[in-house]
Amino acid sequence: MVFTPARPALASIEQSPGTPTAVVVHGSRYVRLGELAPALPTDLTVLLRQWDRYAADVEAIVGSMNTVRRIASNGVSTDYGVFGAPVRDTSTYCAIGNYRGQLMQAALDTSTDTPPDAVRRRVTADLEMRRASGAPFIALTGSARARGTSTPIALDDDALTLDWEAELAVIIGRRAWQLPRERAMSVVAGYSIANDLTLRGAVFRDDVPALGGDWLASKARPGSLPLGPLFVPATRATNPDDLAIQLKLNGEIMQSDRTSDMLFGVVDIISHISQLTPLLPGDVVCTGSPAGFGSHYGRYLRPHDEMEIGIEGLGSQRTRVASARNRSN
């Protein structure tokens, strides 16, 4: 599967700590956005939060063959870029239990006293009912989660059950409040790759087991959402509800599916969230993750693990796990 975008995409690099710079990437090279369009913001987060104002300019740049030629002749190798998240310090919404295969896998893993065929029939019926009359299950997590992909993930001493979740991330470009389904895509700026890192052991609490999942404790730690490196404008992406998605751990495929396995698609998720709270430019919506969590394999992230996520047309994300946060690597 070829994950690389056919056309240029945007990204954010840090030429020095704390100084994000928007760049245009094509293949394995990039140029600074300011070299192509000096009037545009040099910070990709600022640009995305004013997407209505700059969308047409961005479209002209990423759609131009002149951009491709400029990057080919004058671009810098991506090997020399420290990539930050395309957008930072923003609300992050996460769809929970949104892939049919993952829900089936979880049910089979935990229903050891029931024949597998009976489990499959029950789960299939439940999913059909939920799709027909239910709604996406959304968790609002921390605003400091988004992190770049170049810096290793520091593994806290208590993060013994840190799990991976490869996800299609939708980045909002316009304010959305109580949108009908037919208008949902009009507020999408574009797409990126997310790894919705989750402390699996913190999801359910022993002190209040009846209250359900504690998504703040399990998902909200700063830097727990590797995002990017690429941002692909919606006009340059193919159908978000039918993209190949894959995660490798140390070269071994752990997750592999298509976004068509989502129970609720991008339109459903955006419209649903907007009925409950306004979505704002720069907000990140993670759309769920396919089967193949570490909890299924009985194996969580360890120091020096390497993850690679690919989503069709959105590129690849590579991240490495360091050791404890108070150690260098």
Role assignments for model-derived ranges:
Residues 161, 278, 300-301:
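Residue-level "contact hotspot" at macromolecular interaction interfaces
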